[in-house]
Regions:
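N-terminal nucleotide-binding beta1-loop-alpha1 segment
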Residues: 2-32
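A short, N-terminal amphipathic alpha-helix
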Residues: 45-63
Length: 161
């Protein structure tokens, strides 16, 4: 599959914010754990998170985006240590609230970190980690679409965002 071509201004890189949960047993994938057990469900959470981070890092290496991981279920110090281990410099805690509240918070926090007064804010991609088939082509396509549109919603067949 040919990758879409994306041309970005040097200082106009979007940020891909990965929304994930810490892979602690009994604290993630609660619906799945009922069928396969909490230990196996936590392993799946960890694998999905690692896969999504690796795909996003490929985009970052190409100079097309910055990445940030917003994690839930772990403290900030442990999150930063985990981020260093995974070669992710920008790690944040999601904070309290439902998923919509957490997404809104990360959007505005990321926008405020990036915005220079009197400049158009850079694009922000919020994605979850329950995407086993996500590829760098998917992210590049989203970045390309965001260069021409204010918002992009990707398809979801499981009721998520």
């Amino acid at each position: 599959m040919d990758m879409p071509k994306v041309t970005l201004e040097k200082n106009n890189k979007p940020t891909i914010v990965l929304m994930t949960r810490w892979h602690a047993i009994y604290r993630c994938k609660s619906r799945l754990s009922k069928d396969i057990g909490a230990h196996q469900a936590s392993k799946i959470q960890e694998e999905l998170t690692n896969h999504t981070i690796e795909v996003a890092k490929q985009i970052q290496k190409k100079g097309l985006a910055n990445i940030k991981v917003a994690i839930d279920g772990i403290g900030i110090q442990a999150a930063k240590k985990w981020g260093l281990k995974n070669k992710v410099r920008n790690v944040a805690i999601q904070g309290p609230g439902n998923l919509g509240t957490k997404m809104k918070r990360q959007f505005f926090k990321t926008q405020s970190e990036k915005t220079i007064p009197h400049e158009v804010p850079n694009s922000i991609l919020l994605i979850g980690t329950d995407l086993p088939s996500i590829s760098n082509c998917d992210l590049i396509e989203a970045i390309e679409i965001l260069t021409h549109n204010e918002m992009v919603l990707g398809p979801s067949t499981d009721g998520g965002y």
